[in-house]
From Swiss-Prot:
One of its GO terms (cellular component) is membrane. Residues 1-29 form the signal peptide. The lineage of its organism: Bacteria, Bacillati, Bacillota, Bacilli, Bacillales. It comes from the Bacteria. The chain crosses the membrane at residues 149-171. This is Uncharacterized protein YitM. InterPro entries: SdpC-like. Its main location: membrane.
Length: 194
């Protein structure tokens, strides 16, 4: 009888320890919150840990195109431009995502989408007029707002790499015009991060 009681007590103790440890790891995982910038880069540019959590939104080929050195520089500059226009944007995005407010997330992403579209259009114009790298670099130096934005052009031997980045950005969730697909992508983001 004593032996059975000790076995029972051991099983209960091991089970309790296991459940407590499991709850602690779940709590730690929930405590991991991404910054607004990380959420934005992950959702719009498939970059970072957030981008890896959204395979329903980005296919592998698009993820690869959006994770090049040039694409990351482009994303960093877009983030800087958004901060310049709205210093609270990324804090508001983070709050909206973690409060599961898909409508607010959509509203914020539409606002950011306008900034991204302006930058993509500027990049398209530069890429289209690119006869040689040195001429484009000279144009960029003379363009006050975009001089730093397109600094990576000096590392690109041809316009091809820049065009690939632009084409990849054109089909990211921020550029989706179909409301159903856009809502599904936003819902996926909110669900994956909560």
């Amino acid at each position: 009888m004593k032996k059975a009681f000790l076995v029972f007590l051991s099983v209960v103790l091991v089970t309790t320890v296991f459940l407590v440890k499991q709850q602690e790891s779940v709590a730690q995982a929930k405590q991991l919150e991404y910054s607004g910038e990380e959420i934005f880069k992950g959702f719009v540019f498939a970059q970072g840990e957030v981008g890896k959590q959204l395979p329903e939104v980005f296919n592998k080929a698009m993820t690869d195109k959006l994770n090049t050195k040039q694409a990351k520089a482009f994303a960093n500059q877009v983030v800087a431009d958004i901060k310049k226009e709205d210093a609270d944007f990324f804090d508001n995005l983070k709050k909206a995502v973690y409060s599961k407010d898909a409508l607010k997330v959509d509203e914020l992403l539409k606002k950011a989408g306008q900034i991204v579209e302006e930058k993509v259009e500027a990049a398209k114009e530069i890429a289209a007029s690119k006869d040689d790298t040195s001429r484009v670099q000279a144009e960029l130096v003379n363009t006050v707002d975009t001089a730093n934005y397109f600094y990576y052009v000096s590392y690109v031997a041809a316009a091809g790499a820049l065009i690939l980045i632009i084409l990849a950005i054109d089909i990211t969730p921020i550029a989706i015009s179909d409301n159903v697909d856009r809502e599904m992508a936003i819902r996926t983001l909110v669900d994956e991060l909560n």
